[in-house]
Structures are given as C-alpha cells and as structure tokens.
Amino acid sequence: MDNVTCARILSDASLEILPLLDAAYQVRKHYFGQEVRVHILNNAQNGHCQEDCHYCAQAKSSTAEIEEYGMKSDEEMLQEARTAYNKGASCYCMVYAGRQASQARIDRLKRILAQIKVEFPDKEICVSTGFVTNQGAVELKQAGLDRLNHNLNTSESHYPNICTTHTFADRLNTLLAAKSAGLKVCSGMIVGMGEGYADIIDVAKRLRVLKAESIPVNLLVPIEGNVLSPQESNMSPDFILRILCLFRFLNPSSEIRVAAGRELHLRSMEVMALYPANSLFLQGYLNAKGSSNARTLRMIKDAGFSIKSELDLDELLKEQAPQQDLVSDGSKALLKGLKELRPAIQTK
C-alpha cells in the first residue's frame, strides 16, 4: 500500500469510517476470528527513571505524583502472574523503569520467568525493560521469555521532539536484538504527540518490515505533570479508528492492541476499536487507571467477541466485583494508588 493511499485512509472523509472498519474487520476475522487477546500489565518498578521521554509519568522530566517503588519481589511478581491469568489474560506483561537492563536485572528476570513458566507453561510472558543487548535477549529467551516489548512510539524524524536522552536507533537496535534471539516482538506507537500522517504511516510500515507480532496503539494519556499533553485536534474517535484500520491493513497477521487511553479518547466509539484490533489491556495501564474489568469484559461479550483463554467469559463476568468506573476527572487521567499498583501485598 503506497503512502498516498495510507494518507487517504487517515484523512479522506469521503472514505467513510464504517466501510473502512468492515474492511479491516474482514482481515482481522481471517487471522483471529472473533477472539480478543487480553493483556495485563504489571508495573514491576515505578519511577526513578533518568530518561526524559516527554509522554511518561516516570521520566525525570515529569512532575507527576506517582507512587514510586523499587523492583517488586519474586513472590509478588509470581502472585500477580497468577492473578492475571486467573482473570482471563493470555499475556502477562512485566514492565521495568530505566534506560537499560543490567546483568543483575537480567539474572533476576531469568529467575522470575522460570518460576512463572513452571506454573503456567502455556501462557505468554512479555517483558519491557529498556534497552537489551544481543546477549541479554538470548538469555531471556533461554529462560522462557516469549515476547520483548520496546515501543518505537513515533517515527525516526519525529523522535527528537519526544525524547532527548536516547535515539530512535537505540530503540530499533533492541528490537533487532530480540528478533535475532528468536523472541517475538511487541512494539507500537503513541498517538497524540504532535506527529503527522507521515509519522503514523512510517511507524506502521516500519513494524511491518520488522514483522512485529504484537503492535500496541497507545493514545497519549493526559497526566498532570507530564511534558506532553494530547493534541486534541488530532484525537477524534474517527481518526483513532482510521489509525487502527491502517495498522491492520499494513500488518494483517499481527496482534493489534487498542492500548492506553482507549477509554478517554474513543469514548462512545470504544467498542468499534475491536473490529480492526484484536487485543486490549485489562486492569488499566502503568500508572493511569483504566475502565473496570467488568466493563471491559462486558464490552467484549456484548459485541459478540470471545477472549483467548480456557476460562469462560460468562463465568469471569460473574466473578467481577462492582467497581467505580472512573478513569479521569474530566481533563486529566486518574493515577493508580498502591492498592492497584501492588495488589499482591498488603498496603497501609
């Protein structure tokens, strides 16, 4: 698909959204049927990051009031893995703050991975831990890691506008290291950081070349204290759905995830994202709250979709406790407290 056609999908109002969604859905259905893959994030180490990624509440450039803590214990990580899989997740994602995975962290991860795989040998594990060397990627693969996450976030030309402490090439090299080690790759972008059509198209095509197995499409979450705020003129539900369709057309067999910010930016059109996308997060994001598990699972069921799990969706819905479903105060995202960030331990 040439860039002119891609730009038309994003911008041409004469290409109505419903036919586009149907076309993307036919591709999605061919590869994934009616199945939705649920991922649950574990913010395994929060804050204290020396990178200045302008979109991130953990960055040194952010004044967001997050709950900071060091690496969670092995037992805490294992208990939260159990909880994630018992809530219907097909993939458990451990996310660590910081620039690069040290050898000490690699060794710690290898131990945690081995423990999780003993209990859940058939479940996917994804890790996001900054830059990873070729050797580090090989060691993680041998320890049982299925997938490494490292988002490109935006195009190479736009990258200096969102971060100055590392480069686009640094991120790309980590993805290449993961691929060379035989790991699956999870990499996507963040929409709403001042990028243009060309930047969106560039990321979608770059991920196609990389053969990224999983592609999260994040929508910039408005967190008080962060350098960047969403470019609202470019964040209509219609435009977001067009982006998801484009990613599906260019990456037909990849898992496309409607990721952070779906509740805030898609609003009443949120369920429509499941027609081009086949994956989402349950239980919120790294520091920002998401919709309740009950609401998300109900949305999946009501639209006629199923989840990739041996657990029954109806039974999961019955188990959900009533929760307040509030993700923002009207202008800024609500942040998680320790009760949500560290559910496996008792907090005072």
Describe the predicted segments one by one.
Residues 21, 50, 106-109, 197-201, ...:
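Conserved strand-to-helix beginnings and helix N-cap segments that scaffold or border functional pockets
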Residues 21-62, 69-93:
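N-terminal pre-triad scaffold of radical SAM enzymes
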